[in-house]
Structures are given as structure tokens and as C-alpha cells.
Amino acid sequence: MRARMALAYANITIELREILLSDRPDELYTASSKGTVPVLQLPNGSVIDESFDIMKWALEQTKTDWLDINFEDQLLMIKVNDEEFKPWLNKYKYHQRHPERAYEYYQNKCVEILSKYEQTLSNNLFLFGKKPQISDVAILPLVRQFAHVDLTFFMKNLPHLNRWLETWKASTLFQSIMKKYDKWEPGQTPLIVNFNHK
């Protein structure tokens, strides 16, 4: 999601190969031995197989305005999101698989991190001020996942973060990347996509 949003914002056209993680084609492993998505193969043959790195690459091509405010602080926020928040979120989402702790324990661990965003957003439209930055879009997917576990709890306890999330969900940028595509099949006619174009 976040890689596609950056590609859309940067107005970059790609050949899209939509796959199912339950049925990963050999071509995915040919491009990246990790076998995870997203993977971006550049015209020169080099491969970017981390979503944040794809975001950064896309924005550096044409749209650097998401990178111009306290970039090092943004990187730190994204690191916490990806390395600390995500593991707690997975335990919260799938708490039945982690019975060593109560559901509320995992929820509270997530909120410890999200409350910092909540405090910031009580005074700002976005995480680093009045305009979006790469950090907003980088943490968006996991915040959205957290919200959808218990939306009533999220709306009640993190109202500013909820306002921020709803703003993004209503944006044309978010809507532009939510279209569903058919599964890619080897040998098919290439699907050329610019998410920013309707």
C-alpha cells in the first residue's frame, strides 16, 4: 500500500504484476530471493524489495516535498513503526496465537506507540506539521490495520489519529491505489499502470 501511494504521488508508470501470496510465482523469486512483496525491478535490472525503499526511490525521482522536513526524525519514526510497532500489532491482531498474554496487553503495547502520534496530531494536521511527509504514508497501513481490529476502541481512545486516518482514507491518493487487479499470469500482455491516473 505505502509503496503504491508513493508511486502514485510521484506519478510513476509501472508494469504491474499482481500476485497472491498463497500462490507465489517463480518469477517473484527470480526478481528477489526473499519472495515477499512489494518488489520493484528498475529498467537497469536492479531490484528494490523493501516497501520503504521503493517509497524513497519514487519520491526522489520527482516529488521530494515529502522528504523535506526533519528527515532524520522521520526515519526514526518509521523505524519504530516497522521494527517495534509491527510485532505488537501482529500479536494484537492474532492474539489467539499468543495466549501467553491477554488481548488487552497487546492492545496497550500498541497504544504506547500510537499515543505519541496522537499527541502530535492534537496540534498538527500531519505528523510533521501542516503538510504530509513520507512518514505519514509510511505508518498509514499499520495504523489502519490497528484501527480495524477494534474500530470503536480506536475512535474513542485515539480521536486525533482517527481524524488523520480518515483524512487519508478519503484522499484521492489513497483511493487511487485501492483498485483491485486480476492475478498476473506468465505470458499475459503486460499491464501498464499509473496509479495516479483514473
Annotate each PLM feature.
Residues M1-E112, L125:
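GST-like domain detector, emphasizing the conserved glutathione-binding G-site
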Residues L67-D73, S176-E185:
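Short, flexible loop/turn segments with low-complexity composition
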Residues L16, K130, I177-M178:
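A generic structural-conservation signal
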Residues D65, L151, P186-G187:
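A short hydrophobic/aromatic micro-motif that marks alpha-helical segments and, especially, helix-coil
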Residues Y181-K198:
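Acidic/histidine-enriched, glycine/proline-rich intrinsically disordered or flexible terminal extensions
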Residues M77-A170:
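GST-like fold's C-terminal all-alpha helical module
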